[in-house]
Amino acid sequence: MYKRQVSEQCFYGSSGYGYGDMGRETLDKVYAQAFGTEDALVRHNFVSGTHALSTALWGVLRSGDTMVSVTGAPYDTLEEVIGIAGTKGSGSLIDYGVKYKQVDLMSDGKPDLDKIALEISDAKVAYIQRSRGYSLRPALSLSLIHI
């Protein structure tokens, strides 16, 4: 945090538009550095995990791109965002031309690495859901999903 010069000023309010908001930009850089990522988006406005995930998916995927869920079905609430459930034409990723594939877990609850290798060759996003969500399967360990 000292390297990025985080100070009390980073937490002051702004105009709301975010133009030149030193605090937002600084905290994004701190999170990116802490998690070893290219970039980060840190906002108090995300109201749920589905909101955060859908923002990330909409930010990355475009018409013609493919998303592959490599750990079976996603969260129930994410199914409508993707377009595999809910009303057609309501503005899902599929409605906007994103292709969706799914690789189910094997009977022992582990990812099917052979099928995953086949399906992700043309994918823009390989979606890994570690949490069991509302399903009855156990959560996946980090060692199990580290590919």
Can you name each region flagged by the protein language model?
Residues 76-79, 84-143:
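PLP-dependent aminotransferase-class I/II
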Residues 40-67, 74-85:
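Conserved beta-loop-alpha segment that forms the PLP phosphate-binding cup at the N-terminus of a helix
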Residues 15-23, 41-48, 108, 137-140:
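Catalytic cores of large soluble enzymes that bind and process phosphate-bearing ligands
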Residues 1-5, 145-147:
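Conserved small/polar residues in nucleotide/adenosyl-binding loops
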